[in-house]
Structures are given as C-alpha cells and as structure tokens.
Amino acid sequence: MRVVLITLFLFIGAAVAEDAGIDAITPEEGKANNIIEAYESPRFQKFVTHCSSHVTQTCSGNDPLNNQEASRMNSPFGLSFCLFDSMEKCLADHKASLKDPQDNNNLASMSSLPGSIQNQPLLIETVKFRTVLKTCSHVSAQYCFTNPNVATSALADCLMPSLNQCVYPGSILLPWPPPPPPPPPPPPPPPPPLI
C-alpha cells in the first residue's frame, strides 16, 4: 500500500512539474545556475547527516530497541526500504522542513504533503527530495549489501558515508563509490638458507 501511495505522489508531482513547465534539475546543473534544491539546503543537510547515523544503526541490526529491523536486512530490497522509511521517520521526528527558514511560505515536515494550490512549489520539492532519498536508499543498499551474512558493523560503516554521498554528491567528503580496499601486503621474504 505504501509503495502505491508513494508512486501516486510521484506521478502527481511529475504532472504538477510538467504543468508548471519545470524540468528536473540535477545537482550539478543547479549549482552551475545558482539554483539550490531543497535537499541541498545546509539546514536540511544537517538533519540528513544527523539521521544517517540513526538510520544505519537501525537498518544494520545494531539498534537494540528495534530488533525487528534486523530481519528486514535479508536482501538489498528490504534494506533499501528500511533506509528510506527510517530516514523519513527520523526527519519527521526532527521536524525537518524542506524550505529555507527565511522563506515566509508554510513550512512542512517530511511526513505531510500539502494539498492546496499555494503549496505546489513545496509539493514539487517534497517529491524531488523523496525521489532522491528513495534512489539513494536503493543505491546504498545495493552497494553495501554483499550477501545475507554481511557483518553488521561493516554494513553500518558502509551505509552512512554512501547514503550521505549519494544524497549530497556535491559535498565531496568521500569518493563515491568508495575505492576498493588496498591489496594485502606482500608476504615476508623467506629466511636465508642455513649452510
């Protein structure tokens, strides 16, 4: 049911953007044209960065208060849903808004989608952010999830930087995707023969 609702909101957002004549803007295009998307706002980024640690702890199975989430980690698909749902819940808990606090328009949390005509720009930004977050949840889950028996500590260490780097590709904190691990050191030379 949740997937159907999210899909419906995405189609509505796309239709609203098409009617308004607004094209999708990639983060690189936005920076080149001085257009700042809602999900690139420093205030909002602070919440995403803060929530990433909670989300990765929950979805990697390390959260003792949420043992039911550990069972969802059996596939990249389940892990991506866990990442998206946990991030959305954390942002809503922190009342993170999608608009700049300097803006006089109504502010909305992640969990509420405005319905009136005056709030169409906020609806468009909400749909854009949810799309980015959904895509990044899927990409991070695919990248970090190697097999059902992956160590939870390694999973948490991979999820947080990959999720942050995907949502904010302009902030080059870590290379995306992370480079492969360095090769193991060569074995020590054999001891000299005894004469």
Curated annotation (Swiss-Prot):
Signal peptide: 1-17
Main location: membrane
Highest taxon, organism lineage: Eukaryota
Family that this chain belongs to: Belongs to the nodulin 20 family.
Descriptive protein name: Nodulin-20a
Keywords assigned: Membrane, Nodulation, Signal
Subcellular location: Symbiosome, Peribacteroid membrane; Symbiosome, Peribacteroid space
InterPro entries: Nodulin (IPR003387)
Gene coding for it: NOD20A
Pfam family of the protein (one): Nodulin
Any Gene Ontology biological process: nodulation
Any GO CC annotation of this UniProt entry: peribacteroid membrane
